[in-house]
């Protein structure tokens, strides 16, 4: 059960990282096509914050719970 939970947490965090990386790529390749985000830099910073959040979760799981 423990390993299943750890795998699920890691998969969830990795999936969210990929989602936010894809969003950043969209901003880089087509910044004019995003109407609701007039401040592209701020929007990218928010995406990077989310990537950092989930990467931190992965790092903590590996450091403290993965055996």
Regions found by a protein language model. Name each.
Residues 1-67:
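Extended, charge-rich alpha-helical interface modules
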């Amino acid at each position: 059960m423990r390993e299943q939970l750890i795998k699920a947490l890691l998969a969830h965090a990795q999936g969210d990282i990929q989602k936010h990386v894809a969003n950043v790529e969209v901003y880089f390749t087509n910044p004019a096509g995003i109407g609701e985000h007039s401040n592209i830099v701020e929007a990218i910073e928010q995406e990077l914050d989310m990537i950092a959040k989930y990467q931190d979760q992965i790092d903590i799981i590996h450091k403290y719970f993965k055996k």
